[in-house]
Amino acid sequence: MATQRHHRLRARAVRLTDPLQPYLDKKQLVVQSGQTELKQVTTLRWDGPTAQKRMEAILAESYRSKSVDAVLSPYDGISIGVLAALKSDGYGSSSKPLPVVTGQDAELASVKSIIAGEQAQTVYKDFRLLGEAASDMIDDIRNGRPPKVNNRRTYKNGVKAVPAYLLEPTSVDKSNYEYVLVVSGYYTNAELK
């Protein structure tokens, strides 16, 4: 029984749709391609050109008579590939506007795409703060102190809860990119031109 339960937990952990499942069940959100399992939606090496080819195939197979409303991308490099596929399929015109395309990591190309009104947003995690937190944890471990954590319950690996130190991510879009990314010194105005 414990083994079956463990497999069920692992299977549940790899379902991409868990937070979205109520919306899918009510048909408020429809994944036209039917691809919702992690193994179906994973992009090898997070590669933009691979994501572009995959999106081109999805558009050709599942969206000939319907339009795409949103693409939830886990990484900005993938978002750029998705946008290239959408644009080559005619999206981005007044008769066929670009869908909402999200991303993560506030990469330069995606921030420029946000400024241009293409990508809708990106999730920004300041690597300077991440590096500082990691460095502090390493120092604590090297000096025999327990590393500082601020979350002991959320992250589970199938066996136990894994303590973590979480930093607050920031959603960046056209309305706040300058304040979040330029004022903080992450990018300069010249880099974003």
What are these language model-derived features?
Residues 11, 15, 49-55, 106-110, ...:
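Hydrophobic alpha-helical segments within soluble ligand-binding/sensing domains
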Residues 8-34, 50-54, 81-85:
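Short, solvent-exposed amphipathic alpha-helices that sit
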Residues 3-4, 8, 19-23, 30-32, ...:
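Hinge/cleft segment of the Venus flytrap/periplasmic-binding protein
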Residues 105-106, 122-125, 171:
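Flexible, solvent-exposed loop/hinge segments that line or gate ligand/substrate-binding clefts
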Residues 37-39, 43-113:
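Hydrophobic alpha-helical
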Residues 2-6, 37-45, 66-70, 120-124, ...:
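Second-shell loop/turn segments in exported
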Residues 19-26, 54-64, 85-89, 113, ...:
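Structured segments of extracytoplasmic/periplasmic soluble domains
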Residues 70, 74-86, 114-115, 121, ...:
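Extracellular/periplasmic ligand-binding modules, especially the Venus flytrap/periplasmic-binding
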